Regions:
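Catalytic and substrate-binding regions of extracellular carbohydrate-active enzymes
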Residues: 1-131, 135, 142
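Polysaccharide-binding surfaces and accessory modules of carbohydrate-active proteins
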Residues: 104-190
């Protein structure tokens, strides 16, 4: 989670910040999760002590189309400089599942098993948003948040494959005490269904 740095009265907040896709989670059928302040999901397990931390939550009613919507996250601190997380996200139901992952980076450092095609005009300039080339960045009224994703590049491969993306972290808010070469690497394994 990247926190909440945006103004709660802006279009960005209502069209992006409140959306499921903004929060490193799984979007089902291109729709936001249902949100009710009175709903309590089921925390299965939590252990925040020691070098290995674990959280397991079940939230099957977040989407009407799902019977399973469960996330288990393990964080492991190897030493002062290295840590890693393992994210098991299980979803059953719905027709499409989109795992959203982003970081404090404005470019991708390197990838494995991905061949991106830039969504661009004839001059090679980025156009549109994740909705498509004809829907501009920041277009309001699209509740899934896709119009708030720009500089779109897609891998059109249809086969399941393991992929990896390495983000070089950028200190957008000047929070680091010293300049560091920080990276966040995400490795996705293909389906285990």
């Amino acid at each position: 989670e990247l926190g909440y740095p945006i103004d709660t009265t802006s279009d960005n907040y209502y069209n992006w910040g409140q959306g499921t896709i903004a929060h490193n989670t799984v979007l089902v059928n291109d729709r936001r999760q249902t949100y009710e302040k009175t709903r309590v999901d089921a925390p299965i397990h939590y252990d925040g002590d020691g070098l290995v931390k674990l959280m397991d939550v079940d939230a099957p009613t977040r989407y009407g189309a799902t019977s399973i919507y469960r996330r288990s996250v393990v964080m492991v601190n190897v030493d002062d400089d290295v840590s890693y997380g393992v994210d098991f996200f299980r979803v059953k139901g719905g027709n499409e599942h989109l795992y959203s992952f982003h970081s404090l980076a404005d470019e991708i450092f390197e990838t494995e098993n991905l061949e991106f095609t830039k969504q661009a005009n004839a001059n090679g300039e980025y156009i549109g948003s994740y909705v498509g080339p004809n829907v501009n960045y920041g277009t309001t009224g699209i509740s899934n948040g896709f119009s708030w994703l720009k500089n779109v590049e897609r891998d059109r491969a249809v086969e399941e494959k393991n992929i990896a993306v390495d983000f070089q972290i950028k200190d957008f808010r000047n929070q680091f005490r010293e300049t560091r070469n920080l990276h966040l690497r995400m490795t996705m394994l293909n389906s285990f269904t």
